[in-house]
Structure formats: C-alpha cells, structure tokens
C-alpha cells in the first residue's frame, strides 16, 4: 500500500510539474529569450549553424573509446575470480571489437578531415 501511495504521489507531482512548465513557457515567450547566450554580448551572426559531420564522427569515436576505458578499469574488481584467464579473455574480446571498429572507420575514411 505504501509503495502504491508513493507511486501515485510521484506521478501526480511529475504531471503537475510538466503542466506548469508548459504553461509558463507559453507565457514568457519573447525574442531575447529565444536567442542563444553568448557571454552577455549580442550574438555575432547565427548561432544555429550546422556542425561538420566529420566532427560528429570523431566525437562519437572518442566517446566509444572513453567508454572502453570506463569498462576496462573496473574489470578486475568486477570479476571476482581466482582464474584470471576469463577476465583477460573478456578484456581482449572488448579491445578487439573496438579495434576492429576503429580499423573499419579508418578504412572508410571516417577520420579524415579533407577529401
């Protein structure tokens, strides 16, 4: 019963906050609020320019390898085994999959800035 009450209160508060947020958004709409913030100065040109797809690919690659480090560092502590062969095999498989992905991206010229 307590869990049902807590769930009901959470859903009610969430819906109330969503409704209030949408209501206040429509009340205070003016052009200065819609402009991007640029260190307190007026924007120098359009701040809504599209960014390069090459930059996006390099950023995604960086995130993947950053995730690799986040997965590999706690691996010895996460696998509490006396046999380290399984842990080393798991780490090797993870690094191999990421290395194959990097090689594929390199061969497809996804990391080059000029064409």
UniProtKB/Swiss-Prot annotation:
UniProt superkingdom: Eukaryota
Subcellular location: Mitochondrion inner membrane
Keyword Cytoplasm: no
Predominant cellular place of this UniProt entry's protein: mitochondrion
A Pfam match: Oxidored_q4
Function: Core subunit of the mitochondrial membrane respiratory chain NADH dehydrogenase (Complex I) which catalyzes electron transfer from NADH through the respiratory chain, using ubiquinone as an electron acceptor. Essential for the catalytic activity of complex I.
GO cellular component, one term: NADH dehydrogenase complex
Membrane topology label: Multi-pass membrane protein
Documented EC number(s): 7.1.1.2
Gene Ontology terms for molecular function: NADH dehydrogenase (ubiquinone) activity
InterPro entries noted in UniProt: NADH_UbQ/plastoQ_OxRdtase_su3, NDAH_ubi_oxred_su3_sf
One BP term from GO: mitochondrial electron transport, NADH to ubiquinone
Chemical reaction(s) catalysed: a ubiquinone + NADH + 5 H(+)(in) = a ubiquinol + NAD(+) + 4 H(+)(out)
Protein's recorded name: NADH-ubiquinone oxidoreductase chain 3
UniProt subunit comment: Core subunit of respiratory chain NADH dehydrogenase (Complex I) which is composed of 45 different subunits. Interacts with TMEM186. Interacts with TMEM242.
Keyword field: Electron transport, Membrane, Mitochondrion, Mitochondrion inner membrane, NAD, Respiratory chain, Translocase, Transmembrane, Transmembrane helix, Transport, Ubiquinone
Family: Belongs to the complex I subunit 3 family.
Entry's transmembrane regions: 5-25, 55-75, 86-106
EC class name: translocase
């Amino acid at each position: 019963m307590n869990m049902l009450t807590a769930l009901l209160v959470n859903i009610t508060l969430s819906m109330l906050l969503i409704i209030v947020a949408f209501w206040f958004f429509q009340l205070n709409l003016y052009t200065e609020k819609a402009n991007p913030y640029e260190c307190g100065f007026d924007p120098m040109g359009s701040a809504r320019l599209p960014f390069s797809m090459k930059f996006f690919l390099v950023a995604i690659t960086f995130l993947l390898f950053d995730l690799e480090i986040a997965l590999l560092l706690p691996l010895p502590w996460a696998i509490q085994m006396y046999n380290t062969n399984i842990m080393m095999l798991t780490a090797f498989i993870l690094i191999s999959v990421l290395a194959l992905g990097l090689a594929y991206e390199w061969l497809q010229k996804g990391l080059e800035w000029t064409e």
